[in-house]
């Protein structure tokens, strides 16, 4: 009887495996041309033969040549650039900015793009230079749209062929329903929570025929759209050429140089391929090695992208937040299939409100260091189909405060036939759900779990859905690695056991093996009849480019800062040094910064491109950019707690420090400790780039060596500071544990400015000289002792003496600004040897007011705002500013005087009339 019962159960399970249905959403509308067409094989147009040395310009010339060709109207292609076998060194990234252009290697393993240098961007960019433009006004939905439906009630203004933007706003009411207004501590810490407008989901879709005389969407949406807690709307997009089409990277290896002495080095390439404003593109059969961030990242405006048969190995980075998000999807309708990742922090993830469907199919992570799933809030419509995460989890759930308040990371998502250490799936307060079907793991959550620890038919949900939709066999394009399911019982016969022994002798086919053995590159890799890149004539430079070929001459003449013999006039801008949110709605509000870093994202409010910063400063008539390092690196510290972090899961935006990480030990923030004897090469390179590119506009960069904010006031200012002993490998001399005053305030200035201690003196001296070395050849960089500096005379003197020693040793001269309290400033200027070092007197910590002279003493262990609270300086007028500047112009006529004290922006004329420099006037 027991035997019959067992047979009955086995049969029942088999039936359930065949007929049970997972989440009924069609995830197949993803990938190049929605997986309806094969990726095309573009004809080879230009061949780039291998050569030694930097090949950035040669390959870019080939790309530009193909980009200038006419597009084939039938195929949408212009042609391919074919790279020879060999290691092509690159000092600059490659950029495809025109539709129909493909970058191809002759051999996947033997054609290598090897990126050198400290730039943390991508090796290859597929990105349009155009912007999405809207037509007309937003149109509200007149009826609800159901999840997964294509046949919906469109607003009357929509017509066949329109490309439309569909937006589901994140309202206060909806956020409260989701329980994400805060993640603990109530309103006091509500800034970590979701804010209205920050979690908006937006899709781009085309309006197509339904075949019955009506209209429908070309692909389903990954959420239902109602009117109960958000007024969803549709808006027409102007034209359909704002995104690139038919662009790709294929059949090659992307590798990055890194510092072999530092196993956690991050001053090298972070992304392999960066895709933005592209519709119908691909990355196929590409190997990635030694990257810190993502092999491939698709941005919000990337749609219908296929990434297939790609392998990422040997990443090099810290083990922490925003690192090793190997295959990262922030776009829509993206397909990642047959991809392999080793030692990723997040091997396969969607991020930041990615609008589905998006699919990861047949993807394996090996020795995974963190979960896969979604690393941003509210990434809807995510399919994990045959995704295997070795030693870590798949998470479709509420992550709460993690990652700067991710909260619900996904909804309407399905894990199908996956394996992981754990699978987390939750149902959502708004009525949506997450689904797990036929997976193997430890299970956790309130979501929809079916057929746990069982296999399912069909083996691939994606392949099944695609085959059903297209009505044809898709096995060739899906290439499913289907495991044999022989349903062997625990009581096999002798013959069956012997058969299984034979099977066990065969090596298990891994995804890595499957990609290598089954992927066949069919496009042409023949250079015959292709143009030789070295025979392409160089394009003549535009007159505008030639006009800026030489650097303008910066000089101080008769005590005034001049550029091209003209007084430099304009505004001052201070770099932001803390705060920020990785949210689309926040980016436009965040000020420009060149040493802010958001891995995987470039643009306003993130990793701002230096060209954009230069343009913005020019448009705002800024001539003084005041640069200092961040108060702290990691946004977790914005909570002003003083505690040691449990791990290195740091939150962006990151405000970089001037020192390099050592790769050794663990600092208070969970990353490796700093080495105060080495500068952060990325930090330096970004400031240098700003200075060099801004020079043509007459931009001056004030390079602040120190930032006093770290060593006074709130204890949180100090705990992550590189100078704190627990955060460096150099043995700095400060008390540990930190003697917080009142268990929350910090006074470390006395220790910091103690140059009688030989360890501290030598570290300061090395640092100052390295800073001077770094910018020695930039005539528009002004060296200044520090932001918010109210330090003592003896340290100011030491700093100037170190500058003088460096100038004597190198034979070079740099512009030096003296910015400190008035008593210290006057004492310095009265000493002839010190006065000779000073080029610019910078009035910032003192000034005249209607109450009289506001001039707190230096070296009293108080920050500028602490002085102001106590002394309460009065209103500052034209006459006050004029007096402040003119006194020093008359006393030291050979010195330039800059005024950045109170009311500086509105009193530029007073500065100019008094003979000052950089007055804020046009």
Protein language model regions, located:
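C-terminal, active-site-flanking charged/polar segments
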Residues: 379-388, 403-465, 912
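Right-handed parallel beta-helix
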Residues: 100, 109, 168-204, 208-210, 245-335, 348, ...
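Extracellular "leader-to-stem" segments immediately downstream of a signal peptide or signal-anchor
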Residues: 3, 12, 18-262, 436-539
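Active-site mouth of glycoside hydrolases
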Residues: 555-829, 833-840, 864, 868
